[in-house]
Amino acid sequence: VKLYDYVLDHLSLPFQQPGNKIRSAVLFHSEHYQVGKNALFEMIRLGLGKDNCTIITPENAVARERNFLENQLVLIDEILIDGDYKKRLSTLNILKPLMTQELHDSRPLFKNWRQVHSTCKMMLFTNFKNAISVKNNEARYTIIDVGKTRDEMGGDEFFNLFWNTDGTIVEEYPEIVKWFLSTRQISPNFNPKSISLKTKFLETMSKEGGHPLLPE
């Protein structure tokens, strides 16, 4: 499957097969800012419904409450795991079972531990090449470099089409995104239980992120 279709398959599955868990995650990297991440995340969130999609920080992702597990799609924003490779390794080892397993321990504030069944899918975004520590044969993260600036993508003339002056998304666009992702054919060879696609940028992030993760 081509990378373009692979990403669309990841986005389509929560709309078409909400109970089918994807056991890997897509991580977008861009060294540039204002390249449409917020517009994409918000349109997906509104398309799925606010109760089915949430945007969280890395700190929320590893906290014991894990309220986000009840969503169909979890978007983890501004990934940058501070500290040495050991801390990055520890954090990713917490995240990986959340991506690959369906039963998780959760402890909401002032409540006892409980077990939660979740088929949530995950996507991540970062502006930093050294955001995580991954080995060159990492099998659970498809790491994609968004190699264009805002101007190269069309600049304000393009991006302003999606936003109202009050900072909200133009109402029709989430519906268009929802229709497209709900009706497009998922690639016949896309296997949500399979390993991630290996990209050229995986090697870059492996070098920049310090000591690599051990493979599963």
Where are these regions (language model features)?
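Conserved phosphate-binding loops in nucleotide/dinucleotide-binding enzymes
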Residues: R150-T168
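Conserved AAA+/SF3 P-loop NTPase catalytic/coupling segment centered on the Walker-B
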Residues: Q72-M99, A131-E138
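P-loop NTPase catalytic core of nucleic-acid-dependent motor ATPases
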Residues: V1-I79, V177, L181
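Short glycine-/polar-rich loops that comprise or flank the Walker A/P-loop
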Residues: E70-Q72, S118-K121, N136-Y141
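DNA transaction DNA-binding modules
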Residues: H32-Y33, P188-E216
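A short helix-turn-beta junction within AAA+ P-loop NTPase domains corresponding to the substrate/partner-engaging
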Residues: I132-E152
